[in-house]
Amino acid sequence: LQAVLYAGDYEQYAQLLRRYQGVFIVEKPSFWDNLSFMFSYQFNYMYLRYLLWNFVGRQDDIQGKISNNHGNWISGISFIDEWHTGYPQDHLPSDALNNRGRNTYFFLPLLLGLVGLFFQFSSNKRQWWVVFVLFLFTGLALKVYLNERPFEPRERDYALVGSFFTFAIWIGMGVYALYSLLEEKISFKGMAPAVVSLCLLVVPARMLAE
């Protein structure tokens, strides 16, 4: 049964249930079961995981099957990655460390995007709602519409590229927020442009290096 599920072949799974319907007792999921599945799998595993791939880091390019070994997000911060994956990241085998899909951004793009999100909300709520609705409808709302099953035959991160682009708007605003804050708080005129230049160098340079 597990092998059939992992293959993602719904027809074979349905045939298996029909063939052994006298053996398997399949209970109809309740409303709360469906709600739990939506949040834990469709929202968390099939959306938030992809978002964090792009702005925190990615474990490898092997399709995830809700396991600790493949397809998870990682940050490059050892104790966080150990907590998330369930095992230390210090002595990984070479095939894991050298996987072409392995990226670590240390939360930098995500944090910069969150700074931009809160900055836009505090400075112009009307514009914030426009960007937020776009982010919502190209992300979580799309997951509700697609109603994905377990397990898909391949990763579905490409369907969410609009949501990632929208979050990138907040990353740009995060840079401007830092500039505005430093310009207001620090009297030295060259400090704010220097810090902004550092942000522009560190975050994109880290992503390009990976």
Language model feature labels by segment:
Residues 190-210:
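Transmembrane alpha-helical segments
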Residues 1-112:
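Lumenal/periplasmic acceptor-binding loop at the mouth of the active site in multi-pass
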Residues 152-176:
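Hydrophobic/aromatic-rich transmembrane helices and adjacent perimembrane loops
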Residues 102, 127, 144-161, 210:
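Membrane-interface catalytic loops of GT-C/OST-like multi-pass glycosylation enzymes that act
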Residues 106-125, 177:
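Hydrophobic, aromatic-rich transmembrane alpha-helices
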Residues 118-121, 136-154:
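Transmembrane-helix signature of polytopic, lipid-linked glycan biosynthesis machinery
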